[in-house]
C-alpha cells in the first residue's frame, strides 16, 4: 500500500492507495506544535480504526507547504514506517514543464493538482483549489504548467472581518438564504459567500480570456463543494485531485 500525505496550512489530508485504488482517506487539522511521536500516535489511531497497520504501508509520498512539518513527517516515516519517503520538490520527476519565473516558488500542492488534472482530463485546465489560500492554476493543452493566481481563502477572509471590525461577530462560512440579508450574521455570510463566488468567476473568466484555449474548469479543496454550485465557471468538483496527483508522481519516481 502507498500512503500519500498532503500537508496544507489548515489541514493534513492522508490517503491510502492499493495500487490505483484509494481505499481510505482522512482529513485532520494541521498542528505545527505536534511532535513526531504525537503525529505517530495520531496515524496509528486512524489506521487502527481502518484495520490497517504500519507494516501494510510499503511506500510514502509527501507534499507540504509547511516546511516545519515536512521534516517532522519525513522523520515519522523513517521512525514509525521504516520508509524513506518521497517529498515533492526539487529532484522529483513530475513530467510537467513549469513555466514560472522561479519554478521553486510554486507550491507543491499546485504542481500536484496540475499533474493530476492533466493526467485525468488531457485538455487545457484551470484548477481552483479552495484551501487556506485559494489558488487558480492554468495548464495548457500541451500539459505545461503556465502559472496562475493566489487569493485569500474563505476562512481567512471571514476571520479578517471578525478581527478588524470590532462590532462584527465570528460566523460560520455558509450560503445565506438571500443576498439581501436581514441580520448581521447573514449579511456577513452574504458578503463573503457571494463575493467569493464573484471573485472565483471573475478570475477564471479573465484566465480564459488570456489563455484562449477554452480550458475545462475543475475545483478541489475543502470548500469546493460549497462554492461550485453557485459558480457559473466551475464545471466539476474533484475532491481527491491532490491525493491522485501524489499517487501519479510516486509512480513516475519509482
From Swiss-Prot:
InterPro entries: ATPase_NBD, Type_III_PanK. GO terms for cellular component: cytoplasm. Pathway: Cofactor biosynthesis; coenzyme A biosynthesis; CoA from (R)-pantothenate: step 1/5. Its EC number is 2.7.1.33. ATP binds at residues 6-13, 132. Its cofactor is NH4(+); K(+). It is found in: Cytoplasm. It is an enzyme of class 2 (transferase). Signal peptide: none annotated. The active site is at residue 109. It catalyses: (R)-pantothenate + ATP = (R)-4'-phosphopantothenate + ADP + H(+). Its main location: cytoplasm. A monovalent cation. Ammonium or potassium. Homodimer. Belongs to the type III pantothenate kinase family. This is Type III pantothenate kinase. It comes from Geobacter sp. (strain M21). The lineage of its organism: Bacteria, Pseudomonadati, Thermodesulfobacteriota, Desulfuromonadia, Geobacterales. The gene is coaX.
Amino acid at each position: 500500500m502507498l500512503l500519500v500525505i498532503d500537508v496544507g496550512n489548515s489541514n493534513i489530508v492522508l490517503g491510502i492507495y492499493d495500487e490505483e485504488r484509494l481505499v481510505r482517506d482522512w482529513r485532520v487539522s494541521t498542528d505545527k506544535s505536534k511532535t513526531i511521536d504525537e503525529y505517530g500516535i495520531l496515524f496509528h489511531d486512524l489506521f487502527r480504526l481502518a484495520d490497517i497497520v504500519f507494516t501494510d504501508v510499503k511506500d510514502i509520498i509527501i507534499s507540504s507547504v509547511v516546511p516545519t512539518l515536512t521534516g517532522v513527517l519525513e522523520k515519522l516515516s523513517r521512525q514509525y514506517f521504516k520508509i524513506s519517503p518521497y517529498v515533492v520538490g526539487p529532484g522529483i520527476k513530475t513530467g510537467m514543464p513549469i513555466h514560472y519565473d522561479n519554478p521553486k516558488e510554486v507550491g507543491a500542492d499546485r504542481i500536484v493538482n496540475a499533474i493530476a488534472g492533466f493526467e485525468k482530463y488531457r485538455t487545457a485546465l484551470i484548477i481552483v483549489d479552495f484551501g487556506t489560500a485559494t489558488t487558480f492554476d492554468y495548464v495548457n493543452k500541451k500539459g505545461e504548467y503556465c502559472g496562475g493566481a493566489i487569493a485569500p481563502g474563505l476562512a481567512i477572509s471571514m476571520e479578517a472581518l471578525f478581527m478588524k471590525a470590532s462590532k462584527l461577530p465570528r460566523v460560520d462560512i455558509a450560503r445565506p438564504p438571500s443576498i439581501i440579508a436581514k441580520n448581521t450574521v447573514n449579511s456577513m455570510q452574504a458578503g463573503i459567500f457571494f463575493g467569493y463566488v464573484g471573485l472565483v468567476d471573475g478570475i477564471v473568466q479573465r484566465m480564459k480570456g488570456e489563455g484562449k484555449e477554452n480550458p475545462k474548469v475543475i475545483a478541489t479543496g475543502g470548500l469546493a463543494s460549497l462554492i461550485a454550485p453557485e459558480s457559473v465557471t466551475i464545471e466539476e468538483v474533484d475532491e481527491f485531485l491532490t491525493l491522485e496527483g501524489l499517487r501519479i508522481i510516486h509512480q513516475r519516481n519509482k
